[in-house]
Structure formats: C-alpha cells, structure tokens
Amino acid sequence: MSVDSFTSRLAVVMTAVVLVWWAQALPVPSPRRGESDCDAACRKFLLQYGYLDLGEENCTEVDSNRKLCSVDDELVGVPRPLARVDLAAGVSHLQTMAGLEPTGRIDASTARLFTSPRCGVPDVSKYIVAAGRRRRTRRESVIVCTTRWTTTKSNSNETLVKWWLDQSSMQWLNSTLNWVSLTNVLHHSFWKWSKESMLAFQQVSLERDAQIVVRFENGSHGDGWDFDGPGNVLAHAFQPGQSLGGDIHLDAAEPWTIYDIDGHDGNSILHVVLHEIGHALGLEHSRDPTSIMYAWYTPFKYDLGPEDVSAVAGLYGAKPASSVAAWNPKIQKFYWDRHVRNDLLPLLERDLDAEEEDSDEVR
C-alpha cells in the first residue's frame, strides 16, 4: 500500500471518528409539538390516566364521567372531561406527575411507569363521582377537591365518616389475610388520617349506614373501571358523593400482605388502603414521591407525608394534639401477634409507641 493511499484511508477514519464524537456531543433535540416515541402501550396508559384525548371520532361516550376509546383495536376506559393534548405534551405531563424530568420522550424510567403497580384513579381530570372545583395545596403537590364529607358529630366539630367492610368479598382473595387482620388494617389506616384532621371514623355493621364501603373485586365489576389481575392496577376509590362516592375497591387477584418489607413480599395492603382512604376523603394524586398520595406503589411507606397532612387538614381542619383519639391496644396487640412476621414487629412497635403517646396525651 502506498503512503498516499494509507494517508487517505487514515484521514477518512479520523474524519469518521470526529463526526461520531461530534454527533454524540450534540444535545438531544426536544420533540416538536405532537411528536413523540409513544407506542401503543404508552398511548393506552396516557388515555387511561387522563393525559391524552384521542378525540370524539375515536371514542364512544358511556356517561358524563367516562367514555370508551379505541387504541389499536382495543377499547380503553377513559375519564372525562379531558384536555386535548399532543403525545409529547402528554408524556411530559406524566413525567412531571411522576417526579421525572419532563422531556416528552420515553426513556427507561418513563417506560417503567407503564407497568409498575399503581392506583387506578386517573391522575388528570375530575374523577367519577367528584363534583366541584379542584385546588392545590400551598406547595402545589397534592390536589384537593372541594368535594368532602360534611356530617358533623353532635358532641364535637369533627366530621364523622362511617365505613363498612364487605366480608363476603374476601372469598376471592389471593392472600392469607383474614377478616380480623383486614379489619384492623382499616382501623389503623383510618386512625392515621383522623389524628391529622378533624375527622372521626366509625365502623358500622350494615352497608346502608356507611359512606365508605370497602370491598375486593375481580376484573369487570360493574363500575366501569375494570381490574387487570395481578400487577399494574392495585385498587381505586371514589371521591365523596352519593352512590359509589367514597367506596374503595381492591383487586382481589393481587398477592396482598400487610407489610412489604423488601419489595418482594407481595403488595402491602396497609400502604394501599392508606392511599385509597385519601381519595375517599377528597384528595387526588401527588407528584411528590414521599407522599402517600403518590400514584405509584412504593414499598416501605406506611405513614402520611407532610403534603398529605397539610392537604387533609386543609380540607377538614387540623386536629388539636390534645384531642387525638387513641387506638385500642388490645385489638392491635392481638392483630400483630397473630398476623405479622417477627421481622416486621419493629415497624409495628414504632406505631404502637406513637399511638400510646397519643393515648397518654388524651388522658
């Protein structure tokens, strides 16, 4: 090979290397309006959770709160009303809601949102039974609806909310949880909301006396918001109102456990119920990952965050520390002794200590 030929080839190679380096150094261009790498699964997700409206030509109205839209020959239930937005804007909005950088493009973190376990309540739009305007809390993370429960206890200024657990629905459970353990999970979760607000909760023995009905459901169960089996949608709830208002539905097909200590024990029903009660009280999803109202399931989270406390207190009023109701320690001790693994007891002892301190303050 001649020197000139070698020199020419070397120049070509060096030029190619420089061009590759230059291309890699260039910033990734932002998507133009309406442009996105959003595939069918992405579009279905954006529709289902309120980030995108395909337009009336692709949808059939079911009622004033819901319509069915066709996505690649599959019908998807979509909340109404929705803003008409393009795909890139919808993806950016989703990323903002999940606490990610709003690039409008589908990266690995964004793609995981489509399959990660989460609440079935839409992130955008007025949800089903809810009526009235929405407002954000001071730090603009948790959305609070003006729809709320208004029944007041006769001997205090607390708002009394009655709840009922459908024991018969537990026959479909894919779990070892029983009625005693679940009842105590519910008592414990309602207590956490009541100690931060002027709310009082009472379990009742008849469904007709309850504002909040808690039950397990499978697949299509008559409310238009179907469950999808294990994974993805874990539960949904309806905001305060008549008929289904305030009701909490849990997917019976999920591998429910009480505490999910390592992210592999199953889905923590304590975490999910605490989240869904927030919806039943009038709160919507938060973009703050530390909030119990964050839409995606987060192991190890069993308490309200600062945003949650501010939101529920803003809706129902803050409860003075001296009037916080204490948990019944006998019921709770029995519950934990029988239904919690030994390696989870430290978490529960922390909660017990907090509740006993509240009890001492009341006395």
UniProtKB/Swiss-Prot annotation:
Cofactor field: Zn(2+)
Main location: secreted
Signal sequence extent: 1-25
Enzyme class: hydrolase
Propeptide segments, given as residue ranges: 26-126
CC terms in the record's Gene Ontology section: extracellular region
GO MF entries: metalloendopeptidase activity; zinc ion binding
Annotated localization: Secreted
GO biological process: collagen catabolic process; extracellular matrix organization; proteolysis
The protein's Enzyme Commission number: 3.4.24.-
Active site positions, chain numbering: 276
Residue stretches in coiled coil: none
Keywords recorded for this protein, A-Z: Hydrolase, Metal-binding, Metalloprotease, Protease, Secreted, Signal, Zinc, Zymogen
Chain ranges for the short sequence motif Cysteine switch as given in the UniProt record: 117-124
Pfam families registered for this protein in UniProt: Peptidase_M10
InterPro entries assigned: M10A_MMP (IPR033739), MetalloPept_cat_dom_sf (IPR024079), Pept_M10_metallopeptidase (IPR001818), Pept_M10A (IPR021190), Pept_M10A_Zn_BS (IPR021158), Peptidase_Metallo (IPR006026), PGBD-like_sf (IPR036365)
CDD domains cross-referenced by the UniProt entry: ZnMc_MMP
Cofactor binding: number and manner: Binds 1 zinc ion per subunit.
Function: Probable endopeptidase.
Domain notes: The conserved cysteine present in the cysteine-switch motif binds the catalytic zinc ion, thus inhibiting the enzyme. The dissociation of the cysteine from the zinc ion upon the activation-peptide release activates the enzyme.
Record-stated family: Belongs to the peptidase M10A family.
PANTHER family the UniProt entry points to: MATRIX METALLOPROTEINASE (PTHR10201), MATRIX METALLOPROTEINASE-21 (PTHR10201:SF323)
Annotated protein name in UniProt: Probable matrix metalloproteinase 095L
